[in-house]
Structures are given as C-alpha cells and as structure tokens.
Regions:
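Generic low-complexity, intrinsically disordered sequence content enriched
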Residues: 9-13, 87, 126, 153, ...
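Compositionally biased, low-complexity repeat tracts
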Residues: 9-12, 90, 97, 302
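Surface-exposed helix-capping loop/turn segments at secondary-structure junctions
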Residues: 55-62, 211-214, 266-269
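C-terminal single-pass membrane-anchor helix
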Residues: 253-317
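Acidic/His/Gly-enriched intrinsically disordered linker/tail segments
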Residues: 89-90, 94-103, 116-121, 133-266
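Hydrophobic secretory-pathway targeting helix
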Residues: 1-16
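Juxtacatalytic substrate-recognition/specificity segment
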Residues: 16-138, 142
Length: 317
C-alpha cells in the first residue's frame, strides 16, 4: 500500500491545473431565439465557472466545450432528436456528453432540486465532463460517485438535502450502491432521494480524506486500477464500508436524533401546557375565594349584628 501511495503522489504532478492554465474555451448557443439572452449571460460567466470546477477538482478542463441552452427537457422523440438526445427523464435539468464535451441545460429546471441556478447547474454538468475526460475510455465510474461529486462541486449540503434524506430513511432503506452503479431512478421522488444520498456519501468520503480525492482517484484509474481499489486509495475507505458507515451516521443524524429532540420538545410542550393549566386553575380558585370573601364583607356591612332571623312561613289561607 505504501508503494502504491508513493506512486500516486509521484503521478499527481503530471495531472492537475497549473496556475497559469489557459481559460477554457466555452461556446454557448441557444436552441431557440427566446433563449438567446440567457445564453449570452451564461456565455459571459461560463469560462469562470468551468475554471472554478477545474481548480476544485484539480483536473485539466477539455480544450473546448459546447453548452446548449433550452427551456424544458424533451417530451417527445422528435424533440429529443432535434437536440441530439435520447432517453432524457422528464425531471432532468441538464445533460453532459463526456465524449463530445457537449452540455445541454434545461433552463426552466435549473432551480429545481437538487440544483439552484444555471451557474450551479453548469458547474454540475462540467464536473461530469472533466471527470470523464480525465480517465481512460471505458473506465468504470459509478453513477453515485459521478452525481455526488458533481453536486459537491456545485454547492454544499443544505437543509433540503437533510429533509430529503430524513423522508427517505423514514419510509424506506436507502438505495444500495449496486442500484446506483450504472442507472438512476426513473421516478422524480426516488431520483431526488438518490441525489441527496449520493451527495451525502461523497461529502462523508471527502471529510475522511485529505483534499484532492478526485485527482487521486483519477490517477489510480489511469494506472489501471478498478474503481473500488482506486476509491479506497483515494479516500481511505472501501465503497461498501463507506456505504455502511454512511447509513449508520445518516440514520442517527437525519432520523433518530431529530426524532429524539422532537420527542423532548413534545414532552416539554406537554409539561408547559400542564403548568399553564395548574396556574390557571389556581388563579380561578383565588378569584372565587376573593369573591366569597367580598360577599361576606358586604353582608357584615349591611347587617352589623348579623343577618335578621328568617320569618316563619306564611300558611296559605
């Protein structure tokens, strides 16, 4: 293992982004005239976005990238053919073609979970392109790692991710790694849970390793290692062990601990309501005693010698 680590460190110098690297050439086009203003805005910001992705991953960007801006994912085969796409899910916000360096952004979905805006979506898809362009053709990179890494580059974890994970853990077990190797859930609800799971797992792996995990992974894949071995060397955890550790931590963080505090809060609320009820009851009794005392005082004022005796009843004639 030590020899492998030394070889990895030696190979890192041949990879990465030099400080004086050229700004990547990113060409942005609109699929329809109505999207030209947005395409021009993205074109101004795209080189900086792709450069930040390259620096974050410490991987060289491709010499040229093409970004196509349109509105919605294609709904028909004719629309897919017009965009040169195939099998796009209706909830998709973007598509990356690593072999050609082409990215298609569906602008109306750019703010839908797990994304926030077009710049973040572009960073997400650019991560897919950079990662695939850096490894040998045919190298296996599981979908869960692809999506988790792309999301971690796009943004940090959020409350919405926690809610997605809590909902998923409350109603079912997380998807096994095998289910997220090549494919992705077709339904939007399951896809949202898969995105949250992938981001959380990659974030956990990055917390357990020094910076530069993606670059170390690429070096080992270039050396011919299978993904599981390359991932273990890059992050210090076998993927299956990571999944097991993540599941235990996620259940505690997003399910058990919130339920515990919710129970405490609920019991605290019940205790507060009980205390309020006791105080209200005491106040009512105090008022009744005060009213009775006031009545007795008034009777004493009206009849200093005590109340008159009752008159005998009058017998009816």
């Amino acid at each position: 293992m030590t020899a492998v680590l030394l070889a990895t460190l030696a190979a890192l110098g041949a990879l990465g982004v030099p400080e004086d690297h050229p700004v990547p050439a990113v060409r942005v086009v609109a699929a329809a005239p109505m999207w030209e203003p947005l395409a021009k805005q993205i074109a101004r910001e795209a080189p900086g976005v792709v450069t930040r992705v390259a620096v974050r991953l410490d991987l060289p960007p491709p010499p040229e990238m093409l970004v196509v801006v349109t509105g919605d994912p294609p709904r028909t085969a004719a629309e897919e053919q017009r965009l040169g796409l195939d099998g796009v899910p209706p909830w998709a916000a973007g598509i990356a073609e690593a072999s050609t360096g082409r990215i298609v952004l569906f602008a109306r979905e750019a703010a839908s979970y797990p994304h926030r805006d077009t710049n973040g979506l572009l960073a997400h898809e650019a991560t897919h392109v950079l990662l695939e362009a850096s490894v040998p053709r045919g190298a296996r990179i599981p979908r869960w790692y692809h999506e988790g890494l792309a999301l971690s580059v796009e943004r940090s974890t959020s409350l919405e991710d926690a809610l997605e994970l809590a909902w998923s853990l409350a109603w079912s077990r997380p998807l096994p790694l095998l289910a997220l190797e090549e494919g992705w859930p077709a339904g939007e609800v399951d896809a949202r849970a898969a995105y949250a799971q992938a981001l959380s797992m990659v974030a956990m792996a990055e917390r357990h390793a020094p910076p530069g995990g993606a670059r170390r992974l690429v070096v080992r894949l270039r050396a011919g290692d299978p993904f599981d071995r390359a991932f273990t060397i890059a992050y210090g955890l076998d993927p299956e062990i990571l999944a097991s550790l993540w599941y235990r931590e996620a259940r505690w963080r997003y399910l058990i601990r919130p339920a515990f505090w919710a129970a405490l809060s609920f019991n605290g609320l019940l205790g507060t309501l009980a205390l309020v009820a006791v105080l209200v009851g005491r106040e009512r009794r105090r008022r009744r005693m005060a009213e009775w005392a006031e009545r007795e005082r008034l009777e004493t004022v009206d009849y200093p010698d005590g109340p008159p005796p009752l008159s005998p009843p009058v017998n009816p004639a």
